[in-house]
């Protein structure tokens, strides 16, 4: 693995400028610093997206018209515009209404550097409004995904295998075939692998799950 690899953070956005600023603040607060920011503006009419001050220290892809409204493109296809101009060794995804905890990238880069894996994701907290470190938020995997998916797996329930804070080392195809345990804003993936795959397919929904299956 490359020492101190560059991470391109791809953020699609449409008319959610104030949310986007919170997302960008969380990127700026990362303890891992070798980062480039790539924003894909999907035809927003909020003029704050187009100011010189906003453009500073970012790569911005401004799409003239909203691609979802015109062509029916899903969010995966919008991310592809950012992937195309990204120069990082890794691509990390962040939606404009999500934020990261400060050590998110550092932790994942460290884990990837000690393994043969080319992609990493994490659990995520579910909540609304500004993050409050003193508040208890439900987690997506333990509080939602594992409890919702009670179908049998290998003859036993998912909860049998995924006890609290004892997550699997990796996801297999059978798990992904049942439902999606991976939140896109938690993903970091090797850029070469993603480019070899051709990025996300143009699907109206579930393009992210389709992509994760292709990674396997």
Language-model features, listed with the residues they occupy:
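Conserved nucleotide-sugar donor-binding catalytic segment
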Residues: 76, 149-216
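The conserved acidic donor/metal-binding loop of glycosyltransferases
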Residues: 95-99, 123
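Acidic donor-binding segment of Leloir-type glycosyltransferases
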Residues: 24-68
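Short aromatic/hydrophobic "clamp" motif used to bind/position activated sugar donors
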Residues: 91
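N-proximal low-complexity "stem/linker" segments adjacent to membrane-targeting elements
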Residues: 1-28
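Glycine-rich, basic loop-to-helix element that forms the pyrophosphate-binding segment
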Residues: 66-86, 107
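Conserved donor NDP-sugar-binding/catalytic core segment of glycosyltransferases
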Residues: 103-156
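GHKL-family ATP-binding catalytic core of two-component histidine kinases
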Residues: 87, 101-102, 190
């Amino acid at each position: 693995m490359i020492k101190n690899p560059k991470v391109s953070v791809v953020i699609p956005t449409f008319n959610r400028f104030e949310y986007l600023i919170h997302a960008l603040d969380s990127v700026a607060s990362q303890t891992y610093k070798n980062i480039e920011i790539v924003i894909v503006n999907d035809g927003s009419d909020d003029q704050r997206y187009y100011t010189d001050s906003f453009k500073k220290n970012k790569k911005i892809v401004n799409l003239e018209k909203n691609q979802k409204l015109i062509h029916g493109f899903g969010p995966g296809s919008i991310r592809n515009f950012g992937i195309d101009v990204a120069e990082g060794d890794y691509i990390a995804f962040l939606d404009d209404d999500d934020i990261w905890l400060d050590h998110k990238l550092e932790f994942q880069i460290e884990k990837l550097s000690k393994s043969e894996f080319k992609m990493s994701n994490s659990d995520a907290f579910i909540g609304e409004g500004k993050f409050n470190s003193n508040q208890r938020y439900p987690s997506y995997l333990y509080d939602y995904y594992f409890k919702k998916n009670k179908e049998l797996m290998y003859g036993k329930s998912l909860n049998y295998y995924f006890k609290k804070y004892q997550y699997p080392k990796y996801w297999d195809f059978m798990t992904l075939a049942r439902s999606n345990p991976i939140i896109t804003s938690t993903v970091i993936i090797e850029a070469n692998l993603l480019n070899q795959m051709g990025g996300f397919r143009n699907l109206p929904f579930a393009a992210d799950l389709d992509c994760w299956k292709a990674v396997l």
